[in-house]
Amino acid sequence: MPRYRPLLLGLATLAACEGPQPPAHQRIMDGDPRFGRTVVAASGCTACHHIPGIKQPTGSVGPSLAGFGRRAYIAGRLPNRPAMLTAWLLDPPAIDPATAMPAQGLSETEARDVAAYLYTLR
């Protein structure tokens, strides 16, 4: 082990010099959670969902999105991964024809921003 110590020390030093990493939702998705919050508020998502931080009338047709960033699944059965969430937000019925969630007409950028915002809900 002693002869590997300089190598390990060098690798640890390089890792420390890399600097802070952006949050995972920004690294993976390149979405902006601030814009996503604005899109959520403007798109009427609270008509069906309770969304912490959005002060509008809250519906109960869809699930609460509190803690969404910690969930393992989207819509109860799809893996909660950034690409899947973005695809879901773009056109839920294309992924699950039986879903009650309609397509909201979001652009790809808006969907990434909304996904980034949803991942901040922990």
Please report, for each region that a protein language model flagged, where it lies by residue.
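Bacterial N-terminal signal peptides that target proteins for export
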Residues: 1-7
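Short, non-ligating residues that shape and space the ligands of small metal-coordination modules
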Residues: 23, 54-55
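Electrostatic cytochrome c docking/interface patches
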Residues: 18-41
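C-terminal motif of bacterial Sec signal peptides marking the signal peptidase cleavage site
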Residues: 13-16
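Extracytoplasmic electron-transfer domains, predominantly the class I c-type cytochrome c fold
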Residues: 38, 56-122
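Short cysteine clusters
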Residues: 45-48
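Low-complexity proline/serine/threonine-rich segments in eukaryotic and viral proteins
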Residues: 9-11
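Cys/His-rich metal-chelating microdomains
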Residues: 20, 51-52
